[in-house]
Amino acid sequence: GLASQGVTSIFPTVVESDALSNIAEVAEEHEAIGAEILGIHSEGPWLNRVGEKGIRTGWPEISVEKAKKMVSDSKGWLKLVAIAPEIPGAYEVIEYFLSQGITVAAAHSDNHYKEAMEGYAKGISVATHLGNVMTDIHHRDVGGIGAGLLNDAVTCEMICDGMHNCNEMLQIYMKVKDHDKLMMISDCTPLSGAPVGNYTAFGMDVHITKEGFVLTDTGRLLGSSQPVIYGIKNLVNNLHVPLEECLKMACLNPSKKYGFADTKGTIETGKDGDIVVIDDDYNILYTYSKGTLVYDKEADGTIFNQPYIDAIRK
């Protein structure tokens, strides 16, 4: 499925840490016939979701013991943990994850600039989906967004679909931040590739718009069904960002950040041979993984989990 969207390598994302052992088992048994699993990303469980239309959901009890269980359950596959650093007890957990060689990101946070910078000083080195579920830039306190942009040691993720961040905000990010410290992401949900319509997912009713955005029945943005290539098209066509810069932010920078640049991120002799061929309208024509053709649009069409879509469609 993901190969049909031009994806050759992934960190599957879990929100509930109880899923780590299941994903680790899949990763261990997975033979890459499409997107290759390189690690696991845990977005939570310690998040401060006040940014989502004023909803404060709280967070589970935080402890180093819980963090140790997450690492154990992941069987070495856990590479990235996203956390709200202002949560009491977060610094001890951050220190533990870093001691295990796991990258820590700031995510779903309600902190101000000073608090955000304190989190980065503790070793956080990634800002999760910059601008989304974090404190905004204000002329008296530039908040979580400003902290991510101004801290040169921090790599910022960007959702570049034009809705999670408006294009003008994306321009600000790219004017302020060194492009070597920006990573394009999709924020895709399991509904990635699903047709326009109404579904029951994540324990609620959701709607996929014609633009590919996932909305709750109250209109709250709940992620995207559009892949990274959609964001690349937006940046090139609407903001006139050179394609080479987009590819650096989408491919090379993540490979460097997470330690895979020796084999991933560029097309060079000795690397894996992960190649995506597109047409002039950014449709995926062919995807190669380690030099092997794993997707052919003419032969395969658009691939997604049809039984899953049928089960959740309303």
State where each predicted segment sits.
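Active-site glycine- and acidic-residue-rich loops that bind
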Residues: 16-23, 86-88, 105-109, 159-171, ...
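His/Asp/Glu-enriched, well-ordered alpha-helical/loop segment
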Residues: 143-156, 175-186, 191-277
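C-terminal cap of metal-dependent C-N hydrolases
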Residues: 256, 266-314
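Active-site gating loops and adjacent loop-to-helix segments of metal-dependent hydrolytic enzymes
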Residues: 1-9, 48-75, 117-134, 141-155, ...
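Conserved, mostly hydrophobic/aromatic
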Residues: 2, 42, 97, 127, ...
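Divalent metal-dependent hydrolysis catalytic cores, especially in the metallo-beta-lactamase
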Residues: 1-21, 35-48, 75-86, 102-105, ...
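Active-site-adjacent beta->alpha loops and helix N-cap segments on the catalytic face
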Residues: 19-21, 83-98, 113-117, 137-145
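Glycine-enriched alpha-helix->loop->beta-strand junction motifs that scaffold or abut catalytic
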Residues: 74-77, 93-104, 120-126, 150-155, ...
